[in-house]
Amino acid sequence: MAMSDKKDVVLIGAGVLSTTFGSMLKTIAPDWDIHLYERLDRPGIESSNERNNAGTGHAALCELNYTVQQPDGSIDIEKAKEINEQFEISKQFWGHLVKSGEIQNPKEFINPLPHISFVRGKNNVKFLKDRYEAMKQFPMFDNIEYTEDIEEMRKWIPLMMKGREDKGYMAASKIDEGTDVNYGELTRKMAQNLKNSPNVEVQYKHEVVDFERLSNGKWSVKIKNLNNGQVFEHQTDYVFIGAGGGAIPLLQKTGIPESKHLGGFPISGQFIACTNPQVIEQHDAKVYGKEPPGTPPMTVPHLDTRYIDGERTLLFGPFANVGPKFLKHGSNLDLFKSIKPYNITTLLASAVKNLPLIKYSFDQVIMTKEGCMNHLRTFYPEARDEDWQVYTAGKRVQVIKDTEENGKGFIQFGTEVVNSEDHSVIALLGESPGASTSVSVALEVLEKNFPEYAKNWEPKIKKMIPSYGESLIDDVQLMRKIRKQTSKDLELGFYDKAK
């Protein structure tokens, strides 16, 4: 297929994934027509919003669920390597957007912040030390520090050590080159850049309501203008569904075979936010603990310094909260409307297989503020009720699907790319670490669904992401070079301690 073949692409949803994919596509295929439709009145309102997500640069520096203890006691860090490389890829793309002038003021969406792991108990301390020993041997993580010394911990996490009377087994590890990322602000910047670009149309308060496959192979997308109630149709070659929790219902409306035997289980996140500036100023890190035994990885608690609206904040959580909505601004009928004759056995099988997760979720629902505060005090013993308030964050929809390997009703953690056989429909489903790995997800979409353009697009992608086609895991010199460059481009001020 010749590069002169002009195509039309519809992007659904103005979150971080759609705006990332759109930003990339308009650069490598500037003559293509791109139409982005968002049902809300502005971009980044749902899961991408800074108040609705965990806000971390998921780089596997402190998240302990990415480093798994094996039956022989060893620590497998392969997943951590993969996640870290993906975040480095994201930073390269963001740095390109800044250098090219497409977005400005990187400090408004990314700031340096130490990433720390903190554990208590003999077994957890041994796990963290073994993890440290495994990670420091690998160049990607060789700047990791570890301590069991209380005085050192007082320097790293002074707020958490205040009033701590349990002087038993405790340990912490730290990597200074972590970040806090405001994905809402990043999304807004990318959306505005798209709106200002030729051959790109961005429409807010426009809801995609249905699809029809045409005899010429194209899709007729039915769109409702929520400003005046008018419905119109738009013909397109490709449909990209990046609508967060709304992706599964939209995918089902396409009727493609790949939309069958898929379901979703909606979970809200709740955090408690500190309202006392004097407390907020005493903590300067993102601190992860270890998930309680028998609970899913999304339950890992963390105490996070966050930068929101230019101000420093402090959040603790998440706590799960189940409900039928697939989106924060969704309908209480979302879950029930997604149950179809072709996926009901998938959902029922999942319910039987995942009773502990369901029990955990409902236990969390009935947790009061007092319960949240008691959990917080395992991190910050002197926490006072009057300094904290509970708020509901965004929705995540855990993907439930049938697989050959895991049978019916398997719950998929992470981000899932689903596409039609002819690659005309592409949907992004799932959750964490989606935002942090959004650039790698966009690259996967390009490689998987547009192979005929790969040769022509590669030089342009390489300009945006210098490590494209190479491994930051295997090539240590390239990894160090890229980190130094992105630190400069994004004004992070990091330096590589490794020799």
UniProtKB/Swiss-Prot annotation:
It catalyses: (S)-malate + a quinone = a quinol + oxaloacetate. SUPFAM superfamilies: FAD/NAD(P)-binding domain (SSF51905). Transmembrane segments: none annotated. InterPro entries: FAD/NAD-bd_sf (IPR036188), MQO (IPR006231). Disulfide bonds: none annotated. The keyword Nucleotidyltransferase does not apply. One of its GO terms (biological process) is tricarboxylic acid cycle. Its EC number is 1.1.5.4. One of its GO terms (molecular function) is 2-hydroxyglutarate dehydrogenase activity. Belongs to the MQO family. PANTHER family: L-2-HYDROXYGLUTARATE DEHYDROGENASE, MITOCHONDRIAL. This is Probable malate:quinone oxidoreductase 4.
